[in-house]
Amino acid sequence: VEIKSTKGKPVFIYAILPLDYEKGLDSIAQMHLQQYLKKHNLQPGITIHRGHSYWVGSTIRNLPPSSKIVILGSCGGFHNLDDVLKTCPDAHIISSKEVGTRIINEPILKAINDELKEGKDVEWLPIWKDLTAQFPTGDAKERFDNYIPPYKNLGALFIKAYTRQMGSME
C-alpha cells in the first residue's frame, strides 16, 4: 500500500497490510516491499512496526539502514533495541515496554506525520508533551506511559554510548 500526503510537504508511506503469518504471506509481502523500494531507489527514513510482537523479528531483519526513526509499537518492543541499533546505530526509537496498542500508536504516528507535512524537524519534547495531554487519565494514560520516547529511552542511549566507547577503544 502506498499513501501520499495531499497537503503540505510530500510524505510517502509504504505499508504492508496484515496477512496470514502462518502461511508466510507477511514475509512474502515484506520481501516485495523491499524489492519495490530498491527498484525505485527509495530509502525510508522512518520504519514502523505495528501488530503482534511475533512479527517484529521479520521487520527488524528487513530494517533499512536509512531509518532515522524506528517505532516499535507492538507489545514489548523495548526488548528489541539492540537488534534495531545494530542496523541503525543512530536511530531514534519509540518502543513500548508492555502492551502496544492502536489507540496509542495512531496519535504518535499522526503527530510525527503532521510535523513532517509542515516541513518541521521532529522534536520529541514538544511532541511528547502534546501526546501526554491527549491521555490524561485512565487506561489510555496507563498504556501511553508504557511507551518510551527517544529522549527517555535509556536502554537505547546506553547501547549507543557503549557502542561508541567500544569503537573509540579499537
Where are these regions (language model features)?
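Bimodal feature
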Residues: 10, 14, 84-96, 154-157, ...
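Caspase-like cysteine protease fold
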Residues: 124-170
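Residue-identity detector for glutamine
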Residues: 30, 34-35, 43, 134, ...
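Catalytic cores of nucleophile-dependent amide-cleaving enzymes
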Residues: 36-119
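Functional beta-strand-loop-alpha-helix junction segments that form "active/interaction loops"
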Residues: 1-37
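Context-gated lysine
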Residues: 4-9, 23, 38-39, 68, ...
